[in-house]
Amino acid sequence: ATDVYPPKDLGELYKWKSFGVNATEFDNQVMNPRYFKAVCPGRGSQQHWFEAQEAAVEIFGRGRGCITNVVAGCEPLGGMIEGIEERMSKGVYTVPMTFGGAPGSPMAGMRPPGAEWYVEVAEKVVDIYFKYADTLDVNLTEDDRWGYTRRGQSWFSAPSDDEKSRRLQEMGKLPPGLPRQDGIDV
């Protein structure tokens, strides 16, 4: 997937496909338009990002065709979850990532939410994933990219991956065992 700003002319996405691109990643960072202006200054209209994601879904496919990351912890839970559901309903595979204010950035002093908050995010987002799973061209039991389930491999900044793996294990669709870290034998 190409992880870039969306082109101004969304028709360019057809050219990308002709060059061999098979997916896009247009990261929202946040779902609420007011937070988008504050957190993502200089990125243009959030509406254009949404339109680009929807165009990518039409061109590259539902689920695999367009991925977006949301930084969980930069906006209130309710609005973020509503936004994630809205994107997933349109075929945009949305992955919440844990917030960490980078040193030297305007958000350096902002404290991330606690672990319980992230557990709640993971549970609610995974409910959304399973609600729309049959409408997406993604097989959660086989796709090993981060943001999906990575076949039971843990990914530190996307806790919803571990929750998806846990539920798939309960359903008998993934082998038993805790999510694992690559290269670490336990």
Predicted segment positions?
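Auxiliary Fe-S-binding modules of radical SAM enzymes
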Residues: A55, I59-F60, L77-V186
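Conserved AdoMet/S-adenosylmethionine-binding subsite of the radical SAM
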Residues: A1-M110
